[in-house]
Amino acid sequence: MKSMKIAVIPGDGIGVEVMEAALHILNTLDLDLEFIHADAGDACLKRTGTALPEETLEAVGEARATLFGAAGESAADVIVRLRREFDLFANLRPVKSLPGVPCLYPDLDFVIVRENTEDLYVGDEEYTPEGAVAKRIITRTASRRISQFAFQYAQKEGMQKVTAVHKANVLKKTDGIFRDEFYKVASEYPQMEATDYYVDATAMYLITQPQEFQTIVTTNLFGDILSDEAAGLIGGLGLAPSANIGEKNALFEPVHGSAPQIAGKNIANPTAMILTTTLMLKHLNKKQEAQKIEKALQKTLAEGLVTPDLGGKLGTMEMAAEIARHLED
């Protein structure tokens, strides 16, 4: 059986360190994966004159999936371009409490599905004599596609409810289209509960009653904001994985940035990167291996064998070694 090619882009700052930790754990398992290393980010820009070389784009295009560490100031030129270049339309942000990690809600388990290609993030802005104007683009095609993805994901994961988040009471045309397409898709899944909330109410409910949610689907800007808010419920961005999924390609990245202030000190928490690898494995139909890593990570966290940000004394690679040890349990 031919190995699946995985493009590996460590990027900048702690991205390099957490990627090393994740690869150490992946290499402990017999996964039939071939890792193709590629370059991108601030250091790449300084060295080559471009933050995202053509050879990196080629590597991503040829790979079954891409693991990405972190990008610094060049993040928009790297990750945003990769999302657009490969039409990675669905951003998946699981929100799940972890054992041994202090958090606001110890039993959370839901997901935010964010449309990744439209909204204000198309970057169509211009100055006017009085200020500036930005164009918000919401299409029926993209709204239907992301709603379809959300229902399919919820069904696959055994969830019973999908909630659309919008502001159609004010943004009547753009969010009106998003809400309309959501309910058209919902009609194809009569066995599932479909609800919708305004984004401001959702921001409150995430704090007061987050257990009510199972799958949230929303537009680009709202999803960006709400998913970071949700990460705060489970301990912060250092514990949050994400996936960017398209029809043909998929890219997996931790939510945290390059954190240059702690880069090179061997204290970066690898949890988000390791959970990101489990999302990749599930996408590649290696669910058993993903669950094995998740259980090993949970044991390590429960034992307090963690990095300083979680109250422990281990370095990045030391924590990775403990997780790898638990893979053998």
Swiss-Prot record:
This is 3-isopropylmalate dehydrogenase. Binds 1 Mg(2+) or Mn(2+) ion per subunit. It comes from Methanothermobacter thermautotrophicus (strain ATCC 29096 / DSM 1053 / JCM 10044 / NBRC 100330 / Delta H) (Methanobacterium thermoautotrophicum). Its cofactor is Mg(2+); Mn(2+). One of its GO terms (molecular function) is magnesium ion binding. Substrate binds at R83, R93, R114, D200. One of its GO terms (biological process) is L-leucine biosynthetic process. The keyword Manganese applies.
